[in-house]
Amino acid sequence: MKALSRLLPAALAIACLASPAALAASFDCSKASTLVETAVCTAPTLSVKDEQLSALYQPLQHQKVFRELQRRWLREVRNLCKSAICLENAYDQQIERLTPAQPNPQAEAPTLRPSSDQQPYLQITDAPWQRFALATVPGVNPHLYTQVVDVAILDGVLNVVVFVGEHVDQTVRNAGNSYEKRYFGSLYEYSDARSGLHPIVRDIRFSGWNNIGANDQGERYAGIIDGVFYYRHRVKGEAEQSMAYTLGSKEQPQPSTQLFSAESGAKRFSKAMIATDLNYDNTNVMLHYPYERDGNTYDRVMDKNDNGWSVVNPMWNQTRPVLYFDNSGDFACVWRVDLVNKTLEKIVPEHEAVSAVPVDVLGQEALVYLEGDKLMFTIAPQQ
Protein backbone atom coordinates (compact mmCIF):
# COMPACT_ATOMS: atom_id res chain seq x y z
CA MET A 1 0.00 0.00 0.00
CA LYS A 2 1.20 3.54 -0.65
CA ALA A 3 2.35 5.45 2.37
CA LEU A 4 -0.27 7.94 3.44
CA SER A 5 2.30 10.73 3.34
CA ARG A 6 2.49 10.18 -0.42
CA LEU A 7 -1.21 9.44 -0.77
CA LEU A 8 -2.62 12.58 0.85
CA PRO A 9 -0.88 15.19 -1.35
CA ALA A 10 -2.12 13.33 -4.40
CA ALA A 11 -5.62 13.43 -2.99
CA LEU A 12 -5.44 17.20 -2.94
CA ALA A 13 -4.61 17.34 -6.64
CA ILE A 14 -7.15 14.90 -8.07
CA ALA A 15 -10.73 13.99 -7.29
CA CYS A 16 -11.51 10.61 -5.85
CA LEU A 17 -12.32 8.35 -8.78
CA ALA A 18 -15.44 6.17 -8.72
CA SER A 19 -13.44 2.96 -8.95
CA PRO A 20 -14.66 -0.33 -7.45
CA ALA A 21 -12.28 0.20 -4.54
CA ALA A 22 -13.59 3.70 -3.95
CA LEU A 23 -17.20 2.56 -4.10
CA ALA A 24 -16.43 -0.06 -1.45
CA ALA A 25 -16.13 2.63 1.25
CA SER A 26 -19.15 3.10 3.51
CA PHE A 27 -19.63 6.72 2.46
CA ASP A 28 -19.95 8.48 -0.92
CA CYS A 29 -16.37 8.92 -2.10
CA SER A 30 -17.41 11.62 -4.57
CA LYS A 31 -18.18 13.74 -1.50
CA ALA A 32 -15.03 12.94 0.47
CA SER A 33 -14.17 16.21 2.21
CA THR A 34 -11.15 15.38 4.37
CA LEU A 35 -7.72 13.97 3.67
CA VAL A 36 -8.53 10.90 5.77
CA GLU A 37 -11.79 10.23 3.88
CA THR A 38 -9.96 10.63 0.57
CA ALA A 39 -7.25 8.25 1.74
CA VAL A 40 -9.87 5.66 2.72
CA CYS A 41 -11.45 5.92 -0.72
CA THR A 42 -8.14 5.66 -2.54
CA ALA A 43 -6.59 2.73 -0.66
CA PRO A 44 -8.41 -0.56 -1.42
CA THR A 45 -7.61 -2.22 1.92
CA LEU A 46 -8.83 0.80 3.87
CA SER A 47 -12.02 0.91 1.82
CA VAL A 48 -12.73 -2.71 2.70
CA LYS A 49 -12.09 -2.07 6.39
CA ASP A 50 -14.31 1.00 6.33
CA GLU A 51 -17.11 -1.03 4.78
CA GLN A 52 -16.60 -3.80 7.34
CA LEU A 53 -16.75 -1.32 10.20
CA SER A 54 -19.87 0.29 8.77
CA ALA A 55 -21.60 -3.11 8.62
CA LEU A 56 -20.85 -3.63 12.32
CA TYR A 57 -21.89 -0.13 13.36
CA GLN A 58 -25.16 0.23 11.44
CA PRO A 59 -27.26 -2.15 13.62
CA LEU A 60 -25.81 -0.57 16.78
CA GLN A 61 -26.13 3.13 15.97
CA HIS A 62 -29.52 3.48 17.69
CA GLN A 63 -27.74 2.93 21.03
CA LYS A 64 -25.99 5.83 22.72
CA VAL A 65 -23.05 3.74 23.97
CA PHE A 66 -22.04 2.81 20.44
CA ARG A 67 -22.71 6.24 18.97
CA GLU A 68 -20.41 7.70 21.59
CA LEU A 69 -17.73 5.04 21.07
CA GLN A 70 -17.84 5.65 17.32
CA ARG A 71 -17.78 9.44 17.69
CA ARG A 72 -14.79 9.31 20.00
CA TRP A 73 -12.97 6.87 17.76
CA LEU A 74 -13.43 9.19 14.78
CA ARG A 75 -12.37 12.29 16.69
CA GLU A 76 -9.60 10.91 18.87
CA VAL A 77 -8.14 8.07 16.81
CA ARG A 78 -8.94 7.86 13.10
CA ASN A 79 -8.99 11.56 12.26
CA LEU A 80 -5.62 12.12 13.95
CA CYS A 81 -3.83 9.58 11.77
CA LYS A 82 -0.98 10.82 9.57
CA SER A 83 0.06 7.53 8.00
CA ALA A 84 -1.46 4.53 6.27
CA ILE A 85 -0.25 2.22 9.04
CA CYS A 86 -1.98 4.40 11.61
CA LEU A 87 -5.26 4.21 9.68
CA GLU A 88 -4.97 0.44 9.27
CA ASN A 89 -4.43 0.05 13.01
CA ALA A 90 -7.25 2.47 13.83
CA TYR A 91 -9.75 0.52 11.74
CA ASP A 92 -8.59 -2.81 13.14
CA GLN A 93 -9.03 -1.43 16.66
CA GLN A 94 -12.59 -0.23 16.11
CA ILE A 95 -13.61 -3.35 14.20
CA GLU A 96 -12.45 -5.39 17.18
CA ARG A 97 -14.34 -3.07 19.56
CA LEU A 98 -17.66 -3.50 17.72
CA THR A 99 -17.29 -7.24 17.04
CA PRO A 100 -19.12 -9.35 19.65
CA ALA A 101 -16.65 -11.43 21.63
CA GLN A 102 -17.28 -15.13 21.11
CA PRO A 103 -17.22 -17.31 24.23
CA ASN A 104 -14.62 -20.05 24.17
CA PRO A 105 -16.03 -23.12 25.94
CA GLN A 106 -12.63 -24.80 25.67
CA ALA A 107 -10.83 -22.04 27.54
CA GLU A 108 -9.86 -23.00 31.06
CA ALA A 109 -10.60 -20.65 33.92
CA PRO A 110 -7.39 -19.22 35.35
CA THR A 111 -6.15 -20.81 38.54
CA LEU A 112 -6.49 -18.28 41.34
CA ARG A 113 -3.89 -18.36 44.07
CA PRO A 114 -2.59 -15.82 46.58
CA SER A 115 0.70 -14.08 45.86
CA SER A 116 3.64 -16.12 47.07
CA ASP A 117 5.54 -13.04 48.27
CA GLN A 118 2.52 -11.55 50.08
CA GLN A 119 3.24 -8.15 48.55
CA PRO A 120 0.40 -5.66 47.93
CA TYR A 121 -1.07 -5.60 44.45
CA LEU A 122 0.59 -3.41 41.84
CA GLN A 123 -1.26 -0.09 41.92
CA ILE A 124 -2.10 1.52 38.56
CA THR A 125 -3.54 5.03 38.70
CA ASP A 126 -3.89 5.85 35.01
CA ALA A 127 -5.83 2.90 33.54
CA PRO A 128 -7.10 4.19 30.15
CA TRP A 129 -10.80 3.32 30.39
CA GLN A 130 -13.08 5.36 28.14
CA ARG A 131 -15.92 7.00 30.07
CA PHE A 132 -18.84 9.26 29.22
CA ALA A 133 -22.30 10.28 30.40
CA LEU A 134 -25.41 8.37 29.37
CA ALA A 135 -28.10 10.54 30.94
CA THR A 136 -28.92 13.10 33.63
CA VAL A 137 -30.55 11.74 36.78
CA PRO A 138 -33.42 14.07 37.77
CA GLY A 139 -33.64 15.70 41.16
CA VAL A 140 -30.18 14.74 42.43
CA ASN A 141 -28.23 16.78 44.97
CA PRO A 142 -25.27 15.86 47.23
CA HIS A 143 -27.56 15.19 50.19
CA LEU A 144 -29.66 12.53 48.47
CA TYR A 145 -29.11 8.77 48.56
CA THR A 146 -28.74 7.70 44.92
CA GLN A 147 -27.79 4.20 43.72
CA VAL A 148 -27.58 2.11 40.58
CA VAL A 149 -29.87 -0.77 41.53
CA ASP A 150 -29.19 -3.16 38.66
CA VAL A 151 -27.94 -3.38 35.08
CA ALA A 152 -28.82 -5.83 32.30
CA ILE A 153 -28.37 -6.33 28.57
CA LEU A 154 -31.75 -7.06 26.96
CA ASP A 155 -31.87 -7.89 23.25
CA GLY A 156 -28.40 -6.39 22.96
CA VAL A 157 -29.40 -3.10 24.62
CA LEU A 158 -28.05 -1.76 27.92
CA ASN A 159 -30.75 -1.25 30.58
CA VAL A 160 -30.20 0.37 33.98
CA VAL A 161 -32.41 0.94 37.03
CA VAL A 162 -31.55 3.85 39.35
CA PHE A 163 -33.05 4.76 42.73
CA VAL A 164 -33.11 8.36 43.97
CA GLY A 165 -33.88 8.52 47.70
CA GLU A 166 -35.35 11.87 48.61
CA HIS A 167 -35.72 11.58 52.39
CA VAL A 168 -35.45 8.97 55.14
CA ASP A 169 -38.61 7.18 56.25
CA GLN A 170 -38.56 8.13 59.92
CA THR A 171 -41.52 5.89 60.82
CA VAL A 172 -39.51 2.64 60.73
CA ARG A 173 -36.03 3.81 61.56
CA ASN A 174 -34.30 1.97 64.40
CA ALA A 175 -32.39 4.61 66.32
CA GLY A 176 -29.94 1.98 67.54
CA ASN A 177 -28.86 0.97 64.03
CA SER A 178 -27.80 3.66 61.57
CA TYR A 179 -28.25 1.23 58.66
CA GLU A 180 -31.74 0.07 59.60
CA LYS A 181 -33.52 2.65 57.49
CA ARG A 182 -35.50 3.11 54.30
CA TYR A 183 -35.84 6.02 51.93
CA PHE A 184 -38.83 7.55 50.27
CA GLY A 185 -37.88 8.07 46.66
CA SER A 186 -38.30 7.22 42.99
CA LEU A 187 -37.11 4.45 40.67
CA TYR A 188 -35.99 5.30 37.13
CA GLU A 189 -35.12 3.18 34.13
CA TYR A 190 -32.58 3.90 31.42
CA SER A 191 -32.55 2.16 28.05
CA ASP A 192 -29.64 2.85 25.74
CA ALA A 193 -32.03 2.76 22.78
CA ARG A 194 -33.90 5.89 23.93
CA SER A 195 -32.76 9.13 25.49
CA GLY A 196 -32.96 10.04 29.15
CA LEU A 197 -34.19 8.35 32.31
CA HIS A 198 -37.87 7.52 32.69
CA PRO A 199 -39.75 7.05 35.98
CA ILE A 200 -40.88 3.56 36.93
CA VAL A 201 -42.60 4.64 40.15
CA ARG A 202 -42.42 7.67 42.42
CA ASP A 203 -42.62 8.28 46.17
CA ILE A 204 -42.21 4.74 47.49
CA ARG A 205 -40.49 3.42 50.61
CA PHE A 206 -37.86 1.40 48.78
CA SER A 207 -36.38 -1.77 50.30
CA GLY A 208 -33.53 -2.48 47.92
CA TRP A 209 -30.94 -3.86 50.33
CA ASN A 210 -30.77 -5.26 53.83
CA ASN A 211 -28.39 -2.54 55.12
CA ILE A 212 -29.18 0.50 53.01
CA GLY A 213 -26.37 3.04 53.10
CA ALA A 214 -23.78 0.68 54.63
CA ASN A 215 -20.32 0.13 53.14
CA ASP A 216 -21.54 -3.30 52.05
CA GLN A 217 -25.32 -2.94 51.83
CA GLY A 218 -25.97 -6.62 52.46
CA GLU A 219 -28.48 -8.92 50.82
CA ARG A 220 -30.19 -7.45 47.76
CA TYR A 221 -33.96 -7.33 47.42
CA ALA A 222 -34.22 -5.64 44.02
CA GLY A 223 -32.93 -6.75 40.62
CA ILE A 224 -33.60 -7.69 37.01
CA ILE A 225 -34.59 -11.22 35.94
CA ASP A 226 -35.37 -11.95 32.27
CA GLY A 227 -36.31 -8.36 31.49
CA VAL A 228 -38.48 -7.89 34.59
CA PHE A 229 -37.38 -5.65 37.45
CA TYR A 230 -38.46 -6.96 40.86
CA TYR A 231 -38.34 -4.82 43.96
CA ARG A 232 -39.88 -4.49 47.42
CA HIS A 233 -41.39 -1.48 49.11
CA ARG A 234 -42.90 -0.90 52.53
CA VAL A 235 -46.63 -0.39 52.43
CA LYS A 236 -47.46 -0.02 56.13
CA GLY A 237 -45.22 -0.20 59.16
CA GLU A 238 -42.97 -3.22 58.63
CA ALA A 239 -45.15 -4.85 55.97
CA GLU A 240 -43.55 -5.10 52.52
CA GLN A 241 -44.92 -5.83 49.06
CA SER A 242 -42.99 -7.34 46.15
CA MET A 243 -43.57 -5.56 42.83
CA ALA A 244 -42.68 -6.37 39.23
CA TYR A 245 -42.07 -4.02 36.31
CA THR A 246 -41.36 -5.10 32.73
CA LEU A 247 -38.52 -2.91 31.54
CA GLY A 248 -39.46 -0.58 28.72
CA SER A 249 -43.20 -1.20 29.09
CA LYS A 250 -43.98 2.21 30.68
CA GLU A 251 -46.78 0.44 32.56
CA GLN A 252 -47.47 0.60 36.27
CA PRO A 253 -45.55 -1.95 38.39
CA GLN A 254 -47.75 -4.82 39.52
CA PRO A 255 -47.80 -6.83 42.77
CA SER A 256 -45.82 -10.06 42.42
CA THR A 257 -45.59 -13.30 44.36
CA GLN A 258 -42.05 -13.72 43.06
CA LEU A 259 -39.31 -12.17 45.19
CA PHE A 260 -35.82 -11.08 44.22
CA SER A 261 -33.13 -12.09 46.70
CA ALA A 262 -29.38 -12.13 46.11
CA GLU A 263 -26.25 -12.18 48.24
CA SER A 264 -24.44 -9.00 49.16
CA GLY A 265 -22.04 -7.40 46.71
CA ALA A 266 -19.11 -8.71 48.75
CA LYS A 267 -20.27 -12.32 48.26
CA ARG A 268 -22.28 -12.56 45.04
CA PHE A 269 -20.15 -14.06 42.22
CA SER A 270 -17.10 -13.92 44.53
CA LYS A 271 -13.87 -15.54 43.33
CA ALA A 272 -12.22 -15.23 46.75
CA MET A 273 -13.50 -14.23 50.18
CA ILE A 274 -13.19 -10.64 51.36
CA ALA A 275 -11.61 -11.46 54.69
CA THR A 276 -13.03 -8.60 56.76
CA ASP A 277 -16.54 -7.26 57.29
CA LEU A 278 -16.36 -3.93 55.48
CA ASN A 279 -19.10 -2.53 57.70
CA TYR A 280 -16.68 -2.74 60.64
CA ASP A 281 -13.32 -2.17 58.93
CA ASN A 282 -13.18 -0.83 55.38
CA THR A 283 -9.65 0.57 55.46
CA ASN A 284 -8.18 -2.26 53.38
CA VAL A 285 -9.07 -5.38 51.39
CA MET A 286 -7.67 -8.79 52.24
CA LEU A 287 -8.68 -11.68 49.98
CA HIS A 288 -8.84 -15.20 51.42
CA TYR A 289 -8.55 -18.35 49.28
CA PRO A 290 -10.15 -21.00 51.52
CA TYR A 291 -9.33 -23.88 49.17
CA GLU A 292 -5.58 -23.27 49.52
CA ARG A 293 -4.04 -25.72 51.96
CA ASP A 294 -0.31 -25.06 51.72
CA GLY A 295 1.42 -21.88 52.78
CA ASN A 296 -0.15 -18.44 52.47
CA THR A 297 -3.92 -18.29 51.87
CA TYR A 298 -4.32 -14.49 51.75
CA ASP A 299 -3.74 -11.67 49.29
CA ARG A 300 -3.15 -8.18 50.63
CA VAL A 301 -4.59 -5.86 47.99
CA MET A 302 -3.46 -2.54 49.50
CA ASP A 303 -0.30 -1.53 51.30
CA LYS A 304 -1.08 -1.70 55.01
CA ASN A 305 0.61 1.69 55.50
CA ASP A 306 -1.71 3.50 53.08
CA ASN A 307 -4.26 5.57 54.99
CA GLY A 308 -6.47 6.82 52.16
CA TRP A 309 -8.78 3.82 51.80
CA SER A 310 -12.46 3.73 52.70
CA VAL A 311 -13.87 0.83 50.68
CA VAL A 312 -17.59 0.85 49.87
CA ASN A 313 -19.92 -0.89 47.42
CA PRO A 314 -17.86 -4.03 46.67
CA MET A 315 -19.08 -5.77 43.52
CA TRP A 316 -17.72 -8.88 41.78
CA ASN A 317 -17.73 -9.40 38.03
CA GLN A 318 -20.01 -12.33 37.25
CA THR A 319 -17.60 -14.11 34.91
CA ARG A 320 -14.18 -12.50 35.42
CA PRO A 321 -11.86 -12.83 38.44
CA VAL A 322 -12.29 -9.13 39.14
CA LEU A 323 -13.62 -7.13 42.10
CA TYR A 324 -14.70 -3.48 41.89
CA PHE A 325 -15.30 -0.98 44.66
CA ASP A 326 -15.90 2.71 45.28
CA ASN A 327 -13.51 4.48 47.61
CA SER A 328 -14.79 7.33 49.74
CA GLY A 329 -11.44 8.12 51.39
CA ASP A 330 -8.49 10.16 50.10
CA PHE A 331 -8.20 7.81 47.10
CA ALA A 332 -11.84 8.44 46.15
CA CYS A 333 -12.94 7.07 42.76
CA VAL A 334 -13.71 3.60 41.32
CA TRP A 335 -11.11 0.83 41.56
CA ARG A 336 -10.66 -2.56 39.91
CA VAL A 337 -8.97 -5.53 41.62
CA ASP A 338 -7.57 -8.13 39.18
CA LEU A 339 -6.99 -11.44 40.98
CA VAL A 340 -5.01 -12.96 38.09
CA ASN A 341 -2.57 -10.14 37.35
CA LYS A 342 -2.52 -8.94 40.99
CA THR A 343 -3.24 -5.33 40.06
CA LEU A 344 -5.27 -2.58 41.71
CA GLU A 345 -6.38 -0.13 39.02
CA LYS A 346 -8.01 3.26 39.32
CA ILE A 347 -10.44 3.06 36.39
CA VAL A 348 -12.57 6.13 37.17
CA PRO A 349 -10.54 9.01 38.65
CA GLU A 350 -13.36 11.43 39.48
CA HIS A 351 -13.94 11.70 43.24
CA GLU A 352 -17.72 11.93 42.80
CA ALA A 353 -17.94 8.49 41.13
CA VAL A 354 -20.03 6.01 43.14
CA SER A 355 -22.27 2.95 42.83
CA ALA A 356 -20.32 1.15 40.09
CA VAL A 357 -22.01 -1.97 38.68
CA PRO A 358 -20.31 -4.24 36.10
CA VAL A 359 -21.85 -5.26 32.78
CA ASP A 360 -20.59 -6.91 29.59
CA VAL A 361 -21.12 -4.99 26.35
CA LEU A 362 -20.50 -7.15 23.27
CA GLY A 363 -18.63 -9.44 25.64
CA GLN A 364 -16.32 -6.62 26.76
CA GLU A 365 -15.85 -5.50 30.35
CA ALA A 366 -17.69 -2.31 31.26
CA LEU A 367 -19.25 -0.50 34.23
CA VAL A 368 -22.20 1.77 34.84
CA TYR A 369 -21.89 4.23 37.72
CA LEU A 370 -23.09 7.58 39.07
CA GLU A 371 -21.17 10.84 39.13
CA GLY A 372 -23.12 13.72 40.63
CA ASP A 373 -26.36 13.92 38.66
CA LYS A 374 -24.97 11.93 35.72
CA LEU A 375 -25.45 8.25 34.88
CA MET A 376 -22.05 7.27 33.52
CA PHE A 377 -20.52 4.46 31.44
CA THR A 378 -16.95 3.24 31.22
CA ILE A 379 -15.44 0.43 29.15
CA ALA A 380 -12.13 -1.40 29.44
CA PRO A 381 -9.32 -0.64 27.01
CA GLN A 382 -8.74 -3.15 24.25
CA GLN A 383 -5.91 -5.58 24.82
Where are these regions (language model features)?
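Bacterial N-terminal signal peptides that target proteins for export
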Residues: 1-11
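Short loop/turn motifs at secondary-structure junctions
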Residues: 11-12, 343
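N-terminal signal peptide c-region/cleavage motif recognized by signal peptidases
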Residues: 19-21
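N-terminal alpha-helical modules
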Residues: 23-116, 170-178, 239, 376-380
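Sequence signature of WD/YWTD-type beta-propeller architectures
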Residues: 107-383
